[in-house]
């Protein structure tokens, strides 16, 4: 080992020990000072105690998960959007009209044009949950119970939950319920029926089933002019044919309007231009001066 390295290392250790002693000797500790006790000012007489601030109350939530202050507007907007979708779908033979008194109640009627229930006219009412679209599926009740496996023979309610076991927001819509109500009259399903008699007859005795269906259609037709079950200005009601009232409306519906497109195509409408007809030079068209 090089002796110079050992000497230098030893001198470094001694220098470090000397510096530590010097630093230790320079440090002086002062005795702790006793801080004066803090005293609160005396409470004046007849002073009321200070109440603790209360935390703000949680914002009220409506049943559909929105803030209670704008919950009704959100519900109204949702139902308006649903009715717009119904109009756009143009379901054949299905007509609906929201109630005047409540947007959660819709009146409707279904016209069946062929099949086992041909010539059937079935009025119904749709009841929408007040927490729509976060609740269960809407309910659909026929004004007169129709003889059908999926219609309750007492209440006239259609088994809507069969098709919508869980109502999914932004995925299921009311127009789908209306389409389902129309489809059940063309495609009969007898599994887990609400009317067991109708299901058994459809499977075992189709002729007797058809006979009961015809009777049910006749009953609904005979009571078509009855007053609506719910008193509402927008409830759907039928009245006998009155030529003085209905002939004019019938002619308007049957008369086809002449298309205006052909007339517009034949008429040439000149637009603004600064090119003289027959010339390709820009700004060749002379401007007409107005006499003053």
From Swiss-Prot:
Cell location: Cytoplasm; Cell membrane
List cellular component terms (GO): FHF complex; HOPS complex; plasma membrane
Q: Which SMART domains match?
A: UBCc
Gene assigned in the entry: Aktip
The processes (GO biological process) annotated in the record are: apoptotic process; early endosome to late endosome transport; endosome organization; endosome to lysosome transport; lysosome organization; protein localization to perinuclear region of cytoplasm; protein transport
Q: Does the keyword Ubl conjugation apply?
A: no
Tell me which tissues or organs this protein is expressed in: Ubiquitous. Highest expression in kidney, testis and brain and lowest in spleen and liver.
The Phosphoserine modification is found at: 30
Q: Under which name does UniProt file this protein?
A: AKT-interacting protein
Family membership: Belongs to the ubiquitin-conjugating enzyme family. FTS subfamily.
What InterPro entries does the database record attribute to this sequence?
A: Ub_conjugating_enzyme (IPR050113), UBQ-conjugat_E2_core (IPR000608), UBQ-conjugating_enzyme/RWD (IPR016135)
């Amino acid at each position: 080992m090089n002796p110079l390295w050992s000497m230098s290392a030893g001198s470094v250790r001694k220098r470090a020990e000397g510096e530590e002693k010097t630093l230790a000797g320079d440090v002086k500790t002062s005795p702790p000072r006793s801080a004066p006790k803090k005293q609160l000012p005396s409470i004046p007489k007849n002073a009321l105690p200070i109440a603790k601030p209360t935390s703000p109350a949680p914002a009220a939530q409506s049943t559909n998960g929105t803030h209670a202050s704008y919950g009704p507007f959100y519900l109204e907007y949702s139902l308006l959007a649903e009715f717009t979708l119904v109009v756009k779908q143009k379901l054949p033979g299905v007509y609906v009209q929201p109630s005047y008194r409540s947007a959660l109640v819709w009146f409707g009627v279904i016209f069946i044009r062929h099949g086992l229930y041909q010539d059937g006219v079935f009025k119904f009412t749709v009841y929408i949950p007040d927490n729509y679209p976060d609740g269960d599926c809407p309910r659909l009740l026929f004004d007169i119970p129709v003889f059908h496996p999926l219609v309750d023979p007492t209440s006239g309610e259609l088994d809507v939950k069969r098709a919508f076991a869980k109502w999914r927001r932004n995925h299921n819509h009311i127009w789908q319920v209306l389409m389902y109500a129309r489809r059940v009259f063309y495609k009969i399903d007898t599994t887990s029926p609400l009317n067991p008699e109708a299901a058994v007859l459809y499977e075992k005795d189709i002729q007797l089933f058809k006979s009961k269906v015809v009777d049910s259609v006749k009953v609904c037709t005979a009571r078509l002019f009855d007053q609506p079950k719910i008193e509402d200005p927008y409830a759907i009601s039928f009245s006998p044919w009155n030529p003085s009232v209905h002939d004019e409306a019938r002619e308007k519906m049957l008369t086809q309007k002449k298309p205006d497109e052909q007339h517009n195509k034949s008429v040439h409408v000149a637009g603004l231009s600064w090119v003289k007809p027959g010339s390709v030079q820009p700004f060749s068209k002379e401007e007409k001066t107005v006499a003053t």
